Every structure is written in structure tokens, then in C-alpha cells.
Amino acid sequence: MGLVRSFALVIVFLSCLIAVYGQGTRIGFYSTTCPNAETIVRTTVASHFGSDPKVAPGLLRMHNHDCFVQGCDGSVLLSGPNSERTAGANVNLHGFEVIDDAKRQLEAACPGVVSCADILALAARDSVSLTNGQSWQVPTGRRDGRVSLASNVNNLPSPSDSLAIQQRKFSAFRLNTRDLVTLVGGGHTIGTAACGFITNRIFNSSGNTADPTMDQTFVPQLQRLCPQNGDGSARVDLDTGSGNTFDTSYFINLSRNRGILQSDHVLWTSPATRSIVQEFMAPRGNFNVQFARSMVKMSNIGVKTGTNGEIRRVCSAVN
């Protein structure tokens, strides 16, 4: 009954949100022009996920990075010598081949109809459901942008950001502190981080020791996974013990001072966000409902609709 109630709450929330944040997108945008669009995307993501589970956190992260730079217009998908894909924060993005595969199939079924920006938004949702998260309805109708510049990627959230900096970056897109905790938590309950992002926390804090605010019984485990003389490219789960499952254990780890990144850890140590973390520690329920709500809100940042932008024939290049 609890899961049924949670799903019902998601639907109610989304019905309200679409009216507020829709900006021209709507649920079922392709119901007549390409009725199998969402099925094609879902099947494609599932097929790739079966052979490479890393595409799930990769696609979720890619969608977030797309929306935080010029809005959710698929600009992160464009390739080129100075495109967003070449920026330092994006060089390790994973899953472009999934979007390209889905686009090829959609062009065969419905030429020139489904945008790459919508494919990415749908793929992010499907990635969550494939990793045991709750699904939600994604408003569609975005069009694709024509500009992609590495120089525009400067304002993406960083692993070392303080809470104040994270709040400033999120509020620039009308995302509040609750959205921040929700989206960071959802993005980090699956996937990994490079050791280079945590070396200073586990070796080079005050007195050349680990950050004293971390769980000191957890530090040796991280030091074994990320040796001090390593090259920093090895990776560790962002949600220790549950890195492949979309669940609430990320928040439980935060409460145990086991947040991997500094930007994670401050969500627990800061009074402004601790109560939200505590709320989301409960199994499913509130977190899943809020995640769907915040994802819809984020996915409508700066969208192009109507005659703005284009429908790319190939996601990596403008028409």
C-alpha cells in the first residue's frame, strides 16, 4: 500500500508542477506524432544497461549537466573541439552511445520528430527505474539547442563546493535547498567518483591526516581504494554499499559521516540541510516523491519550445 500511495502522490505532484514549470512541455507530447517514442527510448536504455550498468548513473548525470548549462536543450550532446563535452567537468560523461542509438531508432520510426533533449530527459528517468528507483511521467516537447561551448560549463556544481556555493548555483535556476538535497542525493545514490576528488579529504587534511569530521573507521577503506600514490583515476562508489541501487542509503551514509565528496558531507553537517537528509533517510516514500518533483522542475530549466531551436537529425551535430 505504501508504494501505491507514493506513486499516487508522484502523479498528483506532477500534475501541479507541469502547470507551473511546463514552459510548453507536456506529458504525452508525442502521443500522436510518435506514439512509441517513450517505449523506444526505454527499450534502448534497458538494452544498453543490461551489458553496461554504468550507463544508468551516466545518463542521469549527463541530463543534470545538460540542464545546468544553457538549459535542457541537449547541448551537452554536441561534439566539437570546443563543445561542452570537452570541458573538464564533462570529459568523463558516460552514455552518449545510448542516446545516439535511441535517436537512430526514432529517426527510422518518426523522422524529424523527437528531439535529442527529450531523449536525454526520458533516458534519465528510465535509468532511475532500472536501478530500482520509482518512475515518473516526463513532460516532453523540448527542442534542441544549436550552441555548445566548453566555456559555458563553469557554473556546474563541484565536488568541493560548500553548501553556500551549491545553494547559489541551484538558486540561479530557481531550484531551492530542498531541490538541491534531492537532486544531489538522487545523482549520488548511484554511480562513482574518481579518487582524485577525495584525496585531500582522506590524506591531506590538517596535519597530513584525514578530515577529522569523517567517520574515522571508514577512512582506511577509502585509503585502500584510493592509495595516496595513485594516479587519482580509480573510482569509488558515491553510495558505499549500495552504489548500483537507487535508494535512500546515500542519506543514511551521510548521517554516519560517510559522505564521499565534500559537497555531500556538508549536506549533513549544515543545519540548513540536515533535517532534509533526516527526512529522506526513511525507506522510499518522501524521497522518491520529491525526486520526481525536483527532476521535473530541473528538466524544464531554459527549455526551447515552439519554433526555438531545432529537432536534430543526429544528436552529436546541428542540422
Swiss-Prot record:
<feature type="disulfide bond">
    <location>
        <begin position="34"/>
        <end position="110"/>
    </location>
</feature>
<keyword id="KW-0408">Iron</keyword>
<feature type="site" description="Transition state stabilizer">
    <location>
        <position position="61"/>
    </location>
</feature>
<dbReference type="GO" id="GO:0050832">
    <property type="term" value="P:defense response to fungus"/>
</dbReference>
<dbReference type="GO" id="GO:0006979">
    <property type="term" value="P:response to oxidative stress"/>
</dbReference>
<keyword id="KW-0479">Metal-binding</keyword>
<dbReference type="Pfam" id="PF00141">
    <property type="entry name" value="peroxidase"/>
</dbReference>
<feature type="binding site">
    <location>
        <position position="71"/>
    </location>
    <ligand>
        <name>Ca(2+) 1</name>
    </ligand>
</feature>
<feature type="binding site">
    <location>
        <position position="247"/>
    </location>
    <ligand>
        <name>Ca(2+) 2</name>
    </ligand>
</feature>
<protein>
    <recommendedName>
        <fullName>Peroxidase 62</fullName>
        <ecNumber>1.11.1.7</ecNumber>
    </recommendedName>
</protein>
<dbReference type="GO" id="GO:0046872">
    <property type="term" value="F:metal ion binding"/>
</dbReference>
<feature type="signal peptide">
    <location>
        <begin position="1"/>
        <end position="22"/>
    </location>
</feature>
<keyword id="KW-0560">Oxidoreductase</keyword>
<dbReference type="GO" id="GO:0020037">
    <property type="term" value="F:heme binding"/>
</dbReference>
<feature type="binding site">
    <location>
        <position position="69"/>
    </location>
    <ligand>
        <name>Ca(2+) 1</name>
    </ligand>
</feature>
<feature type="disulfide bond">
    <location>
        <begin position="195"/>
        <end position="226"/>
    </location>
</feature>
<dbReference type="InterPro" id="IPR010255">
    <property type="entry name" value="Haem_peroxidase_sf"/>
</dbReference>
<keyword id="KW-0349">Heme</keyword>
<feature type="disulfide bond">
    <location>
        <begin position="116"/>
        <end position="315"/>
    </location>
</feature>
<feature type="binding site">
    <location>
        <position position="66"/>
    </location>
    <ligand>
        <name>Ca(2+) 1</name>
    </ligand>
</feature>
<dbReference type="GO" id="GO:0004601">
    <property type="term" value="F:peroxidase activity"/>
</dbReference>
<feature type="active site" description="Proton acceptor">
    <location>
        <position position="65"/>
    </location>
</feature>
<dbReference type="GO" id="GO:0005576">
    <property type="term" value="C:extracellular region"/>
</dbReference>
<feature type="binding site">
    <location>
        <position position="157"/>
    </location>
    <ligand>
        <name>substrate</name>
    </ligand>
</feature>
<keyword id="KW-0732">Signal</keyword>
<keyword id="KW-0325">Glycoprotein</keyword>
<feature type="binding site">
    <location>
        <position position="189"/>
    </location>
    <ligand>
        <name>Ca(2+) 2</name>
    </ligand>
</feature>
<keyword id="KW-0575">Peroxidase</keyword>
<feature type="binding site">
    <location>
        <position position="73"/>
    </location>
    <ligand>
        <name>Ca(2+) 1</name>
    </ligand>
</feature>
<feature type="glycosylation site" description="N-linked (GlcNAc...) asparagine">
    <location>
        <position position="253"/>
    </location>
</feature>
<feature type="disulfide bond">
    <location>
        <begin position="67"/>
        <end position="72"/>
    </location>
</feature>
<dbReference type="GO" id="GO:0140825">
    <property type="term" value="F:lactoperoxidase activity"/>
</dbReference>
<keyword id="KW-0964">Secreted</keyword>
<feature type="binding site">
    <location>
        <position position="75"/>
    </location>
    <ligand>
        <name>Ca(2+) 1</name>
    </ligand>
</feature>
<dbReference type="InterPro" id="IPR002016">
    <property type="entry name" value="Haem_peroxidase"/>
</dbReference>
<keyword id="KW-0106">Calcium</keyword>
<dbReference type="InterPro" id="IPR000823">
    <property type="entry name" value="Peroxidase_pln"/>
</dbReference>
<dbReference type="InterPro" id="IPR033905">
    <property type="entry name" value="Secretory_peroxidase"/>
</dbReference>
<feature type="binding site">
    <location>
        <position position="242"/>
    </location>
    <ligand>
        <name>Ca(2+) 2</name>
    </ligand>
</feature>
<comment type="similarity">
    <text>Belongs to the peroxidase family. Classical plant (class III) peroxidase subfamily.</text>
</comment>
<comment type="function">
    <text>Removal of H(2)O(2), oxidation of toxic reductants, biosynthesis and degradation of lignin, suberization, auxin catabolism, response to environmental stresses such as wounding, pathogen attack and oxidative stress. These functions might be dependent on each isozyme/isoform in each plant tissue.</text>
</comment>
<feature type="binding site" description="axial binding residue">
    <location>
        <position position="188"/>
    </location>
    <ligand>
        <name>heme b</name>
    </ligand>
</feature>
